[in-house]
């Protein structure tokens, strides 16, 4: 085996372990592989072996690109238990080098290798997270390659899902929700495969961290605007949480484009799943996020934000965090959506007919933007809102009166819409002859609503506990015994109750 190994590798080093531990660059892939494998034999460092391996990888990252022909032999001999970070770095070197040379065969092989190791669960997810500047750009680039170059989005989706799942298990753990550049590509692949349910668990409405995808040595060189952008995003990405409830991790390093990709593509997935409230939350953040210049995602998000707002609220409000000048710019760039944004639902004004007319006149623009189905849904929803407004006015009503007051075309249309409202559990209905007896139902809270409420309660309990701890540890008037003894004079010692002693 040693002979075979030496034939595959060149420039072997007999002092690989010593070189690695001293921080020296290792001159060959064989030396690097030996240095990493020897980490597992050093029992005293078993707990931080992943960090040591990550340090070796960063010190020798250029070696993987220079020796890309030796990558497969390296993968065969490197132990994934200690060398997961090195193995993905090797695959990234092979992928990047092949892509730069337009070597499609080499690029395909790199994707095949990554798919194999991820699919077999060979990598240690905890070790992969230690090299975010390697694993996440690799997943992102592989996903885009499968999506755009090979027209195989299902492969890119499977690879990213498996890799992210190993690093951030979705098993109810209390691990922080982390945003990476790979998430947006994952959602883009799912929009092509139409496998929305599989990626739904990866769409977090409460993001705790942004992955630092800049190399640690390059952090000082990163653009301050990118870090400011990340801080603003984290400050807003807390759906259902009390204002300022969570501390934000400072100085995240991720290009704003990938954050916008996450927001926009994630919102598109949620729209397909009919989770309109959550989609609106992501779209509102995307529209309101600052950027160096107006990105395509900003304008596309504004268009969908207008339509989803009308579906949910019957009107379009200016986003709380939005830049009013940017909103005006969006309206100027999309006059059709400007007309939609001026709609205000009113039963007596026959709003659904006005919306239907706008949809017909803007059908070409809607089709180009991919919003035709949302617009059709909007027209139906406006008709349902008209019927819902009647339930608040009358507890019983004739079908013919519903048809007249809701400006609907036929009795069949009335009964069809009422049937849909019953199926959606928005009203209960009892029909007796031509009379309809109905009641509006309160919406059933979704799983996300319940989780958000629990998160708020947990946060309030934490604040209460911290407050009590501060009071007990404080001095003077901060102590509870003094606070309840204010009338006894500042010079008097606090009185302690003996009632229950």
Swiss-Prot record:
The keyword Nucleus applies. GO terms for cellular component: COP9 signalosome; cytoplasm; nucleus. Signal peptide: none annotated. Residues 275-445 form the PCI domain. PANTHER family: 26S PROTEASOME NON-ATPASE REGULATORY SUBUNIT 3/COP9 SIGNALOSOME COMPLEX SUBUNIT 3, COP9 SIGNALOSOME COMPLEX SUBUNIT 3. It is found in: Cytoplasm; Nucleus. This is COP9 signalosome complex subunit 3. Keywords: Cytoplasm, Developmental protein, Differentiation, Nucleus, Oogenesis, Signalosome. Component of the COP9 signalosome complex (CSN), a complex involved in various cellular and developmental processes. The CSN complex is an essential regulator of the ubiquitin (Ubl) conjugation pathway by mediating the deneddylation of the cullin subunits of the SCF-type E3 ligase complexes, leading to decrease the Ubl ligase activity of SCF. The CSN complex plays an essential role in embryogenesis and oogenesis and is required to regulate microtubule stability in the early embryo. Mediates mei-3/katanin targeting for degradation at the meiosis to mitosis transition via deneddylation of cul-3. One of its GO terms (biological process) is oogenesis. Belongs to the CSN3 family. The keyword Nucleus applies. The gene is csn-3. Component of the CSN complex, probably composed of csn-1, csn-2, csn-3, csn-4, csn-5, csn-6 and csn-7. Within the complex it probably interacts directly with csn-2 and csn-4. May interact with itself. Its main location: cytoplasm. It holds the Pfam family COP9_hel_rpt. It comes from the Eukaryota.
């Amino acid at each position: 085996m040693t002979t075979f190994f030496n034939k595959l590798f060149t420039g072997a080093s007999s002092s690989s372990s010593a070189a690695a531990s001293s921080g020296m660059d290792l001159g060959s892939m064989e030396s690097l592989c030996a240095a990493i494998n020897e980490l597992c034999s050093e029992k005293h460092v078993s707990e931080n072996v992943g960090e040591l391996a990550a340090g070796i990888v960063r010190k020798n990252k250029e070696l993987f690109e220079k020796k890309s022909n030796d990558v497969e032999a390296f993968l065969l001999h490197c132990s994934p238990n200690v060398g997961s970070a090195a193995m993905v770095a090797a695959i990234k070197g092979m992928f990047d080098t092949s892509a730069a040379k337009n070597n499609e065969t080499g690029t395909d092989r790199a994707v095949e290798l990554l798919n194999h190791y991820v699919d077999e669960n060979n990598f240690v997810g905890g070790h992969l997270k230690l090299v975010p500047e390697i694993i996440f750009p690799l997943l992102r680039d592989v996903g885009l390659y499968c999506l755009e170059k090979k027209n195989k989005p299902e492969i890119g989706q499977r690879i990213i899902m498996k890799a992210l799942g190993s690093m951030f298990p979705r098993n109810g753990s209390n691990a922080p929700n982390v945003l990476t550049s790979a998430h947006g590509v994952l959602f883009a692949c799912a929009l092509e495969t139409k496998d929305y349910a599989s990626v739904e668990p990866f769409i977090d409405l409460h993001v705790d961290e942004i992955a630092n995808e800049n190399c640690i040595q390059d952090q000082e060189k990163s653009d301050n605007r990118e870090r400011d952008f990340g801080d603003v995003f984290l400050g807003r990405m807390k759906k259902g949480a009390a204002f300022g409830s969570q501390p934000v991790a400072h100085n995240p390093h991720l290009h704003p484009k990938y954050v916008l990709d996450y927001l926009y593509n994630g919102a598109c997935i949620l729209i397909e799943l009919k989770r309109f409230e959550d989609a609106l939350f992501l779209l509102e953040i995307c529209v309101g996020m600052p950027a160096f210049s107006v990105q395509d995602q900003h304008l596309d998000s504004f268009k969908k934000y207008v339509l989803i707002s009308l579906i949910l609220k019957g009107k379009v409000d200016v986003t709380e965090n939005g830049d009013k000048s940017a909103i005006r710019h969006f309206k100027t760039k999309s006059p059709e959506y400007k007309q939609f944004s001026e709609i205000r639902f009113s039963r007596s004004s026959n709003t659904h007919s006005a919306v239907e007319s706008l949809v017909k006149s803007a059908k070409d623009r809607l089709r180009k933007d991919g919003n035709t189905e949302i617009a059709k849904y909007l027209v139906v929803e406006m008709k349902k809102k008209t019927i819902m407004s009647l339930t608040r006015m009358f507890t019983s009503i004739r079908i013919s009166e519903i048809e007249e007051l809701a400006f609907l075309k036929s009795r069949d249309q009335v009964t069809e819409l009422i049937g849909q409202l019953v199926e959606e559990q928005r009203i209960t209905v009892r029909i007796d002859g031509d009379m309809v007896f109905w009641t509006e139902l309160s919406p059933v809270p979704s799983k996300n609503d319940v989780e958000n409420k629990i998160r708020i309660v947990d946060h309030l309990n934490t604040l209460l506990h911290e407050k009590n701890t501060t009071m007990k540890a404080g001095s003077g008037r901060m102590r509870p015994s003094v606070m309840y003894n204010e009338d006894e004079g500042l010079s008097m010692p606090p009185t302690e109750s003996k009632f229950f002693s």
